[in-house]
Amino acid sequence: MSNKLEQLRKLTTVVADTGEIDAIKKYQPEDATTNPSLILKAAQIAEYAPLIDASIEYAKAQSNDKAQQVQDTCDMLAVNIGKEILKTIPGRISTEVDARLSYDMEGSVAKARQLVKMYNDAGITNDRILIKLASTWEGIRAAEILEKEGINCNLTLLFSFAQARACAEAGVFLISPFVGRIMDWYKAKEGRDFEASEDPGVLSVTKIYNYYKEYGYKTVVMGASFRNIGEILELAGCDRLTIAPALLAELEAAEGEVVEKLVDSKGAAERPAPMTHAEFLWEHNQDPMAVEKLAEGIRNFAVDQGKLEAMIEAKL
């Protein structure tokens, strides 16, 4: 019998949640996802030094203003890392918009267009890029605009059913509902461990997946943020799963049958009317975990973006 990673690939598109080229070469995922924390981590790897130097050189040619140079270097570094990753995968790279723009629709759209132009100027076409945005109301509206321009989006930091519904109604290409971070919250609150089959994060993604398929939404569901392979295996059959290298290694080393847990019902039920802004805020606010985790996720990505900027500024 093949290992669990090989079996999982037959049921689900496997994506690597990393900016590290060596890990991507080793596990040969279809796609890869990055975020500000992963870019910061990758920027500290020696083999990426030339990419940082090239990004600084680009930024200095764009502007004499140091603050602008820092911004441009960070953007170009994310794109340069994305370009390197694209050499080793057949699919798409997800590159994230600055988390500090999470409540700024116009700013998010402008930054997304800028990142896509950087990729396009390097010969990378839109069908190989996903722009990551936080699943705030403003982020979802930004994605709605971008999708109409042919820029596909990956809506991340998704914790509530309201966020998932709003994303589908906006016609976004893909969502990344988080699993492990939801489980973390309930584990801390209830002071207990969860079996994978009753893991609150697993149940959340399962509910979202089944809802999308029941109403025939085309938005891709890509489970993210895993704490163990049990969570991953409970979501076998999900459209895509983005998995960190350590858990890909565990799956590769594990033997035993992988059972399909999520099955596309191929439904075509009449869809409810799209949520209003007020309805979205009300429904999202009914979920204390989601409110807390969305805010925390944005703050943490912003902190890592700040660390990356400080590192770049020291090199300018």
Curated annotation (Swiss-Prot):
Catalyzed reactions: D-sedoheptulose 7-phosphate + D-glyceraldehyde 3-phosphate = D-erythrose 4-phosphate + beta-D-fructose 6-phosphate
Keyword NADP: no
Organism: Vibrio parahaemolyticus serotype O3:K6 (strain RIMD 2210633)
Family statement: Belongs to the transaldolase family. Type 1 subfamily.
GO annotations of cellular component type: cytosol
The protein's Enzyme Commission number: 2.2.1.2
Keyword tags: Cytoplasm, Pentose shunt, Schiff base, Transferase
Biological process annotations from GO: carbohydrate metabolic process; pentose-phosphate shunt
Pathway participation: Carbohydrate degradation; pentose phosphate pathway; D-glyceraldehyde 3-phosphate and beta-D-fructose 6-phosphate from D-ribose 5-phosphate and D-xylulose 5-phosphate (non-oxidative stage): step 2/3
Function: Transaldolase is important for the balance of metabolites in the pentose-phosphate pathway.
Record-given protein name: Transaldolase
Residue numbers annotated as active site: K132
Domain of life: Bacteria
Main subcellular localisation: cytoplasm
GO molecular function: transaldolase activity
Pfam families (alphabetical): TAL_FSA (PF00923)
Subunit structure as annotated in this protein's UniProt entry: Homodimer.
